[in-house]
C-alpha cells in the first residue's frame, strides 16, 4: 500500500515558500524558452497547449492555448484513480479487495500486469500499477469495477468541462469506439494537479492517496526529462526537487501534467502536443520541446 503519511509530508513545504534566487522584475522571462520551443512546433503544424500555475500564489505563469481540448491519451487515467480513491475513502470497497483479470480486459502496450502470472490483484495494487506504469490491463479491470459512468460523474462534479476519460483502453479503435482514450485542456489539468497537491480533490485522504499512486510514475521522458530524477525511484526529495506527474502517449500525441516542488517554489503544469508522427525526427523535436518546458519550470522552482 502507498504510504500516505510520507506523501503528505513531502508536499507540506508547498505552503511555506522561500524567496526565489532567480526572480527578477518579472518571471515571464523564465518561460521564453518554452514559448520559442512550442512556437516552433506550432509553426511546423503541431497543435500545442501549455499551462503552469504557482502552487503557493495561484498565479498563472504560462498559458498557451490552454483552454483548447486536445487528446491526452493515458492522462485521463488520473480521473479513474480519483474515483477509485474516493470510493476507498468512503469504504465502498476495500483496497485489499481482489479483482480478477478476464479475457475482455486484455490489452497490450503499457503496463506490467499482462506480463505477470498473477490472475488477480488487490484494488490498491492495481491503482499503484496504473500510477507507476500506466498499466492498461489494470486500468480496464478497475474501470469494469467502478464503471465509466461513475468516472464521468466524478469528473463533472469536480467542475471539469474540457477534460474526460472517454473509454476503456483498446488495442485498436473502430468506428463505434471513442476516437481517443481521453481528452483535456491544459488549464484544467494544471488546476487538477494544483488541487491534488493542496489536498482539495474530494478530501485530504483521497487527494493524498492519488498523489501517492502517481508518485510511482516511471515515465520521465517528456517535460520531466529535464529534472534529473531517477525514473524508477523519485518518490522522495532529490536535490531539493520533488515531482508527481502523469503522462500520456499515443501515435501523434505526447502529453504530461504534474506538480513540481523545488527549493523555493512549486508549480502545477500541463503540456499537450498533437503532431504528425511521420518519423523519428518529428517525434524527437516534440520531446525536445517538452524538455525545454521542463527546464524553464525547473529554473522557476529553484
What residue ranges belong to the model's regions?
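Active-site SXXK
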Residues: 58, 71-99, 269
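Conserved catalytic neighborhood of penicillin-recognizing serine enzymes
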Residues: 106-140, 179
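A short glycine/serine-rich beta->alpha loop
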Residues: 63-71, 112, 116, 175-178, ...
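Short, conserved catalytic-motif segment at the N-terminal edge
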Residues: 44-69
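Short glycine/serine- and small hydrophobic-enriched flexible loop segments
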Residues: 82-90, 144, 191-198, 299
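Mid-domain, small-residue-enriched loop/turn segments at the edges of structured enzyme/sensor domains
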Residues: 45-48, 143-198
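Structured C-terminal helix/loop/strand segments within mature extracytoplasmic catalytic/sensor domains
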Residues: 2-42, 61, 196-230, 237-302
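Short, glycine/proline-biased beta-turn/loop segments that scaffold the active-site neighborhood
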Residues: 90-116
Amino acid at each position: 500500500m502507498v504510504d500516505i503519511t510520507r506523501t503528505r509530508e513531502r508536499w507540506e513545504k508547498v505552503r511555506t515558500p522561500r524567496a526565489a534566487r532567480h526572480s527578477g522584475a518579472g518571471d515571464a522571462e523564465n518561460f521564453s524558452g518554452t514559448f520559442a520551443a512550442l512556437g516552433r512546433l506550432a509553426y511546423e503544424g503541431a497543435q500545442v497547449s501549455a499551462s503552469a500555475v504557482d502552487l503557493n500564489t495561484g498565479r498563472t505563469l504560462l498559458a498557451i492555448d490552454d483552454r483548447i481540448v486536445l487528446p491526452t491519451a493515458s492522462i485521463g487515467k488520473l480521473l479513474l484513480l480519483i474515483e477509485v480513491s474516493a470510493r476507498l475513502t468512503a469504504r465502498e470497497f476495500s483496497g485489499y479487495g481482489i479483482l480478477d483479470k478476464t479475457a475482455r480486459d486484455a490489452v497490450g502496450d503499457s503496463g506490467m500486469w499482462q506480463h505477470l502470472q498473477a490472475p488477480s490483484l488487490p484494488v490498491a495494487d492495481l491503482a499503484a500499477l496504473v500510477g507507476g506504469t500506466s498499466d492498461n490491463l489494470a486500468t480496464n479491470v478497475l474501470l469494469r469495477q467502478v464503471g465509466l459512468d461513475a468516472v464521468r460523474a466524478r469528473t463533472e462534479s469536480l467542475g471539469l468541462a474540457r477534460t474526460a476519460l472517454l473509454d476503456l483502453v483498446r488495442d485498436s479503435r473502430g468506428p463505434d469506439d471513442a476516437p481517443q482514450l481521453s481528452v483535456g485542456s491544459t488549464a484544467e489539468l494544471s488546476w487538477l494537479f494544483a488541487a491534488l497537491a493542496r489536498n482539495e480533490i474530494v478530501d485530504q485522504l483521497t487527494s493524498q492517496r492519488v498523489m501517492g499512486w502517481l508518485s510511482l510514475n516511471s515515465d520521465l521522458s517528456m517535460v520531466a526529462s529535464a529534472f534529473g530524477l531517477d525514473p524508477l525511484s523519485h518518490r522522495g526529495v532529490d536535490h531539493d526537487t520533488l515531482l508527481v506527474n502523469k503522462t500520456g502517449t499515443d501515435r501523434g500525441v505526447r502529453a504530461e501534467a504534474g506538480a513540481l516542488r523545488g527549493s523555493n517554489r512549486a508549480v502545477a503544469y500541463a503540456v499537450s502536443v498533437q503532431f504528425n508522427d511521420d518519423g523519428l525526427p518529428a517525434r524527437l523535436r516534440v520531446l525536445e520541446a517538452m524538455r525545454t518546458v521542463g527546464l524553464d519550470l525547473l529554473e522557476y522552482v529553484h
